[in-house]
């Protein structure tokens, strides 16, 4: 499952960042790397971007970018 697939109020652990180059580095710099716990806070009114919380930091990502972050959902 990717961050783009998750709904507000759901959470999980980042398993993999599958983007390459600048995009992958940008996601890692925002704190999205394997092992990090993330929580989907909300979607914007039009559904894009999505706001997430990663280790106490709030980040807004376009769904296009969120597709590159693979997450293991918390059950």
Give the predicted meaning of each segment.
Residues 1-75:
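Compact, glycine-rich, soluble single-domain proteins
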């Amino acid at each position: 499952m990717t961050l783009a697939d998750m709904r507000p109020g759901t959470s999980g652990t980042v398993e993999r960042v599958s983007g390459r180059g600048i995009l992958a580095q940008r996601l890692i710099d925002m704190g999205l790397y394997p092992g990090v716990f993330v929580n989907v806070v909300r979607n914007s009114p039009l559904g894009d971007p999505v706001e997430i919380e990663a280790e106490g930091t709030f980040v807004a990502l376009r769904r296009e970018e969120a597709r590159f972050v693979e997450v293991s959902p918390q059950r």
